[in-house]
């Protein structure tokens, strides 16, 4: 029976890397990179080291492993995997030794003695520490800048009772069998990976010469050599009773030997002729013991584990091993998800056993490098301070003029993010308080005595804790689709969003993508397989919450023999699914819920309905003339002046000149052509400025661009603007039109003429089918109400008898279509038949029905701007379009008199207020349908 006594001392502590346990008599490398606590500890004891050397003692500190969620902190009770809370598992996976708290430490540790500093090529420096003596933490005195605790150091004594002696003999027998297996060269494929005869001889001498007084050291040594798990080593460290420790090590060795023998047919050889004199464990070189342990843990795979080489002079093996060590360090720093950690550990074990010359070695290493490059948990912290919304609004306004809808939606998202962050902060504080209370009752608080909670109180606290965890608000970023014509700033707007949020930005061009594998990656079985565009983008930005621009999503290829790329985007753009997005190459769930996706498209027609349903659509209309003028003055003109080598003030364009360029030389929804034309103007002035400078007459240079110069610079006008007539005439009405290219509107004259005939109606002006039907509806209404309008003397008389009509819309080369000219056609027919002229300062738009109702139409904003520019004073609009006038610039709404009508009779009274119509009081009751 082993016993131990202890003495209390104050001890600095060093948390060991995750998965590492230091036992007495064993050496361990502790990397010093990314370990501020270790650096602070070493700098603190560096003064003591001089004194220590004079006293003949070494530098020592306590080496404490991190606790395991599957084992109680005292190492005596295993926790069932099924009962383990998922949050505790994830919390353990995220623990880093350099950032650990006292709650993360195991209760037992080993005093370590620094025996050297090791630095290999291509590898980080590390302290080489040898375990000396077990200790138990009583209470932690401080956590920062390094841990310091009050600990009980245990002095071990091994009793010589029969049961202990029997266990010791059994341990020696099992150790010999393991040594025999290690020495069988037939199990090892290459001479370079065989166990060195010198190391084997030292190992054999140590096992044979050990007597029962060395039982504790032999048990610790074999526990480190054997293929034991992290929790098993923690239990051995916590076994202060030598007898219990022997039982556990015997169990581990028995299991490992049975596993080896089940796979390989082995004849066991034992040796009995060894002297029984005492033997010191330090006779075995620490590096030799480390090599021996790593070979045993490799499971007799035949390959030397990374970080070690069988021969001392094998530089190539050292280089390959150090590369794998570096890869392991990168994986540890990557803070992988639990699923990714499990896969990475498995692949890393495979990589350690592979020969670097093996073709699969490069594939496996590339796969692990890709996993390490993915930002699993690293995120950009959103700038969500008190000035967040104000700063974001200013950023968006500085970068883009107009586009109020999308700006409003993005500011809403920022406000929601800020509120969620505030709520989560309060919830986390409550969770932390309850967790500490629960851990203290379990004996986790080492500093003070806390009464144990009753079962009822424990259940109540755990229930409240669970409810608080469900109150955490997740950040599901919206998935926005910006739809609009080319050149309106969809792509640059997404970049401004990232800038206002302070996030990384990445653009993915989807135009012409026809292979599903480009989105989701190729399977690892293919040669040169790589991740898809989404995962590659995450690797490039290096954070898990960037802004992704999916450009031209409407131009993604359809289904073909290579798959359907648009179908592959369904999982990416579904907020309910993309937190477990699976790339074919990585084949591990990746959380995309933190990514803010902004897609752009010119049209919705080619986007599949299921994909469109997953996105929040925001339509961006083309810029109006007023907006283009502001954009030109604030952005385009200064940009072109700088691009052409000029300075501010060397090119001056008045509002009149800018408007002339917009209306007469461009007709587009965006501003790309406008920028080109402004560039032409700047280059023209640059030539003039250069000529004046060469001639020494800079004072003669005129920076102002006049209207007369425009035709010389840009050529003849490409588009002629319609201007309102000064005099009205019967049959001519001013309508309103919004160009299909978007962004611009104008007036459109509708001319109606009659002639003797047989009732035929002729339509010219390149009119579309809908516009032709609109003329027919207008004519039918006028014919049906000819008596009420005073056009016929009898209700049964046909106004079209012996008469034919010709309806024409000027600018015959331009296609025209749509129902919005119905009201103008009706008023034109009434004007022709009554001989009353429609005032030229009045324009109108609206669809009409056979009942005479005026129904809403689109393009109101563009039409009103065009009407004001053409000199119109009054505009008749459908009553249901009142809501659209809110989007009109203030200068337009104030410059026009806007009249809303619901019926043709209301429009008639507005156009001819002084005229009398026989049936104007009965039109709401009477119906001719």
From Swiss-Prot:
GO MF annotation list: ATP binding; ATP hydrolysis activity; ATP-dependent peptidase activity; serine-type endopeptidase activity
Span of domain Lon N-terminal: 11-257
Reactions catalysed: Hydrolysis of proteins in presence of ATP
GO annotations of cellular component type: peroxisomal matrix
This protein's UniProt keywords: ATP-binding, Hydrolase, Nucleotide-binding, Peroxisome, Protease, Serine protease
A biological-process GO annotation: protein quality control for misfolded or incompletely synthesized proteins
Location of the region described as Disordered in the Swiss-Prot/TrEMBL record: 302-325
Motif Microbody targeting signal: chain residues: 927-929
Domain Lon proteolytic residue range list: 727-914
SMART domains, sorted: AAA, LON
Record-listed E.C. numbers: 3.4.21.53
InterPro entries to which the protein is assigned, alphabetical: AAA+_ATPase (IPR003593), ATPase_AAA_core (IPR003959), Lon_bac/euk-typ (IPR004815), Lon_lid (IPR054594), Lon_proteolytic (IPR008269), Lon_Prtase (IPR027065), Lon_prtase_N (IPR003111), Lon_prtase_N_sf (IPR046336)
Entry-linked CDD domains: RecA-like_Lon
Active site per the UniProt annotation: 820, 863
Pfam families for this protein: AAA (PF00004), Lon_C (PF05362), Lon_lid (PF22667), LON_substr_bdg (PF02190)
Binding-site list for ATP: 484-491
Taxonomy, superkingdom: Eukaryota
Localization terms from the record: Peroxisome matrix
Family: Belongs to the peptidase S16 family.
Reported function: ATP-dependent serine protease that mediates the selective degradation of misfolded and unassembled polypeptides in the peroxisomal matrix. Necessary for type 2 peroxisome targeting signal (PTS2)-containing protein processing and facilitates peroxisome matrix protein import.
Name of protein: Lon protease homolog 2, peroxisomal
